[in-house]
Design a protein with these regions (language model features):
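Repeated polar recognition positions within modular binding domains
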Residues: 1, 27, 87-89
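Short beta-strand segments at enzyme active-site cores
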Residues: 1, 53, 83-84
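N-terminal binding-site loop/beta-alpha segment at the start of enzyme catalytic domains
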Residues: 1-19, 136-137
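Glycine/small-residue-rich loop that forms an oxyanion/phosphate-binding "nest" at active or ligand-binding sites
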Residues: 10, 26-73
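Short loop/turn motifs at secondary-structure junctions
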Residues: 15, 47-50, 78, 102
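Extended hydrophobic secondary-structure segments that form protein cores and membrane-embedded regions
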Residues: 21-24
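Beta/alpha (TIM)-barrel catalytic core signal, keyed to glycine-rich beta->alpha loops juxtaposed to Asp/Glu
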Residues: 58-190
């Protein structure tokens, strides 16, 4: 969706600096040269001089080479921050100890049913931001009707989604909730 995002930002009339743009290097582009090429392609599709955050999608393939490409682009100012996603503690520790610039962000599935407390502590030890992918558990396990979340929400006049987001934020986890509904977007900020 990089082309569409780039076009939308350009057409919005809002200064580029007001947006925080994240992209990922996919497994199919792993390895130093291929990853670097894909970063340049992302910049071109987005019609931008820099990307705020670039992540490795998963720890498969030559992810060390991929990370070296991201470090290079970071040093060149093409990326403002670099990190990983779906790196559980063992893989995270491994890469954090053997790269020049440790990951600044690790995006991993995190929600009230899968809190990733051990992973969080590991990231914290490396000054890495823990970013939640799927803070609503993708709606699984009847998430929005969960009895505990609903009860807490009633107490504070909030939705179960708001309760779940608040829990993560209070525990120093960055959240990226997904919705296409304007009213839910507004609720997610409340």
């Amino acid at each position: 969706n990089e082309e569409a995002v780039g076009n939308a930002i350009r057409k919005s009339g809002i200064p580029r600096e007001e947006f925080f743009v994240t992209s990922k290097v996919w497994i199919s582009n792993s390895g130093e040269e291929q990853a670097y090429k894909s970063i340049l392609e992302s910049l071109e599709k987005l019609q931008m001089d820099y990307i705020d955050l670039m992540l490795i999608h998963q720890p498969f393939g030559d992810y060390y080479g991929t990370y070296r490409a991201m470090e290079r682009a970071y040093k060149e100012g093409k990326l403002k921050a670099i990190g990983v996603s779906n790196f559980y503690p063992d893989r995270f520790i491994d890469i954090a100890n053997f790269v020049e610039i440790p990951p600044m962000v690790n995006q991993v599935e995190t929600h009230v049913f899968q809190q990733q407390k051990k992973a969080h502590e590991v990231m914290k030890g490396y000054n890495c931001i823990h970013e939640s992918w799927g803070p609503f558990a993708e709606g699984r396990k009847d998430f929005f009707n969960n009895e505990t979340l609903v009860e807490i929400g009633k107490k504070y006049n909030k939705t179960s989604a708001q309760v779940a987001l608040r829990y993560l934020i209070q525990n120093d986890v960055v959240v990226i909730p997904k919705t296409v509904h304007k009213d839910r977007m507004i609720q997610n900020f409340d």
